[in-house]
């Protein structure tokens, strides 16, 4: 059994055969068997829609679909017989995931799944939180609560509130943020910094702090990426509430980054520091000693830094963003040797090509993540280098990082081809991870919406099509961690879980939130509603820009406060002058695209 993704080129109803062409230009003849099923793409919580009786109307030239079937070797070739077909819309150029509300409804469903999985139907009590969640949403017996996974779920719940206005999601985000502050945060008053524990081990009424990482790659060290993602959820919550305690935590954690992780002379940030001296050059760090990597430099922007800037407009955040993006543009490309960026470095930026599991391998999604975030930054601080690198990545990635027959994006591949090889070899497998599909969708959506181009929009649609067809779990809820190359779910080991060290609603929610923003304001040109709930002690200037978007691409059209129209706002700068209040204000804004 295998999958073909492509576009109908012709259909012979009498013979029950149609031709389709893939993104690579290969043509396949598809035989429709009598027991073949056909359906319309559906979202989480939507019913199955049978399309079998409408095949003559739907198998028209240009229709985009997935076909799952069997290749039978026969004669000098093969016969491909379809067993399942999924149509992405009702006619050519029609994509269900571009309809208004698709990603909002998906995020609403995700939030409902994780709310039930972690807290059941009762009160929200983070003492019950578990890092590992089974396929069906059942909590495991593991009592280690990892800081980053809580923060990632908080991010998801905050994002769900921003799109739906459901107070329950904000309650979960705020309680999670407070739980992180109360249990996972260490305040070093002597050095005026904050850092975050790896997690806590909960046993009855007792908890044991886990200061250093328990993850194999980072064991007994303080990795930069764990400190970064500890800020993800609280920062997204800060955008909604303006809670000054959160902004203080952001600034004090950034002081940790500047004082102990930053390489002031050489540029960038080190990936790990030791837990005693807080030094990146201590021998106890072993293979992580004096190293820099993608996470330590590139993950600041999407995890918290862009959102901190959106919430405040403060120059210190923009300046750090510019520094990190300048560093990426200067040191990460390696196009004389590979179509993939290099991701690991020594202090002097020479390439570390033998580091643990990665060696000289590329994480496909990190390349796409660079393109996506460069285009975000380019809207605030335009630079030719940012735009050029983002466009280059967008152009060269599909043939080396994506599946040209089945759709979707691969995981980890060798950066170099050996003599005689035509394809970059897979590191371990040809499976496809949910978060890498997210990077592709967002990268090509923002490229399509900013620099334009039919190719970018086509790549965005193909990536979103694969994700929505194969990653949504219509039986248990939420999304799968990994699928096989064909799109079938891969349900072994930790990849069977819906919650783990690597998965806790963050990437799936980020995708829903930003796909809504980019699709509405840049692609289909539809209004976008967002919700905020600033505290009485928050700044009286509420910034409601949904992301770093090109100047003049949207404006603030309407504002409601506590359900009533409110007129004191700046349409062009997307800010609201809040009235004084002794209570939190419920603010709903509508943003509209500007042609």
Q: For each of these PLM feature ranges, what is it?
A:
Residues 1-595:
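Glycan-recognition and catalytic cores of secretory/periplasmic carbohydrate-active enzymes
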